[in-house]
């Protein structure tokens, strides 16, 4: 419970017999794990050797409330050697860096009058109501996903904040359907 409050509130309280001290605890959590004990669940070419129920037991070692506080959850499949050895494809790192800098500048301007807020991840409900407005199509997509994956209110907030960030990276003043639909690959 203390960990979850630390992640949400970005501070931690340490209590001793006669006093309580608050410490700042803003951080970015980056974590990884295998999809199952053997590492081959959902692998495109290798078969998972885990006995029935092992994958579920393995996944349940991470609490649902903790997973619910991780903004981005991405399954990464192995890359075949031929793709690794070929010339790089996609957007160059320098171009991505420029998009990120522009998005951070957009957020800095957006929250210039909010001393405790520097980026979309730090938005409270009031700021989300102002800056994370969805059009009719985006709301329909979100409603369908929330129902299909039985997502929590915390997941709803997380999706809106990440969609706002994707829109910023796209230099879009509005959150559009394609900014939200990328977020439903993991419930």
Give a label for each model feature.
Residues 2-3, 187:
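Positively charged, low-complexity/disordered segments
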Residues 8-186:
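Basic, amphipathic alpha-helical bundle interface domains used for macromolecular binding and assembly
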């Amino acid at each position: 419970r203390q960990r979850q409050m630390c992640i949400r509130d970005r501070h931690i309280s340490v209590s001793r017999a006669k006093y309580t001290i608050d410490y700042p605890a803003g951080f970015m959590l980056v974590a990884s794990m295998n999809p199952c004990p053997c590492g081959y669940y959902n692998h495109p070419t290798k078969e998972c050797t885990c006995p029935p129920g092992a994958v579920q037991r393995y996944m349940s070692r991470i609490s649902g409330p903790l997973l619910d506080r991780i903004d981005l959850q991405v399954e990464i499949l192995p890359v075949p050697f031929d793709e690794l050895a070929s010339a790089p494809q996609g957007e160059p790192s320098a171009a991505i860096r420029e998009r990120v800098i522009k998005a951070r500048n957009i957020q800095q301007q957006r929250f210039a009058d909010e001393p405790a807020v520097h980026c979309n991840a730090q938005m409270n409900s009031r700021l989300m109501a102002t800056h994370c407005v969805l059009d009719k199509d985006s709301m329909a997509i979100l409603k369908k996903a929330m129902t299909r994956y039985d997502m929590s209110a915390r997941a709803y907030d997380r999706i809106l904040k990440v969609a706002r960030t994707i829109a910023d990276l796209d230099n879009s003043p509005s959150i559009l359907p394609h900014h939200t639909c990328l977020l439903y690959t993991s419930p």
